[in-house]
Amino acid sequence: MLARIASACLASGRNESDVELVAITKNHPAEVVAELVDLGHLHFGENRDQEASPKSLRLAEIRPDSKPTWHFVGQLQSNKVKSVLRYARVIHSIDRASLVSELAKQLPKFEGSYSGFIELNLTADPGRGGVLPENLPALAESVLNLENFELLGVMAVAGLGEDPKAEFEKVLSASRKLQELAPSANQLSIGMSEDFEVAIAMGATHIRVGSAITGPRPTNA
């Protein structure tokens, strides 16, 4: 995996250090995460609080000296915000005003710094997670007002069956609009196991890779 990232960075004239690999460990036990910690990896992504919360506690038990950074990458329900903030420092899926309101309520209760991305909906399906690009500036304004929270940029998932390059072009366009409002919010959380090399070529700063690192999910997951 690291060799593929290095090759993609070399091909696009980028430094490997500019791309953060977030290992998606959903449906895998804390023991698998511990193996990755032993290899020196410390950035992990989860998409369900009911799985991630106990997993983070278990990892702290079996690797008490490790200091992982947990990324929450799934659609975040407002009633799960408080629980997620107990372990995740980076939220990749901010997508609506009600979620920002709950973050504003809960963030002051926690110490340390947090950061995250606004998730974009690249489809015409309003039921899918993410904010439509035309609504990005208004949502960004509210995120920028959060206490102790840094807006890093935008996140998106390329649609199934869609050309990832064309999809990521939409993300780049939205990112440029966001930077007019918040110049430092220039990071891109794009790219998964199937398309991370395209994402790196398009400027990804965070890639979210699961099966290419951990292998297939357990059959009972």
Predicted regions and their residues:
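Conserved alpha/beta-domain cores
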Residues: L2-E194, I200-M202, T214-P216
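Divalent-metal-activated hydrolytic enzyme cores
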Residues: T205-H206
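Active-site loop ensemble at the mouth of alpha/beta enzyme cores that anchors a bound cofactor
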Residues: N220-A221
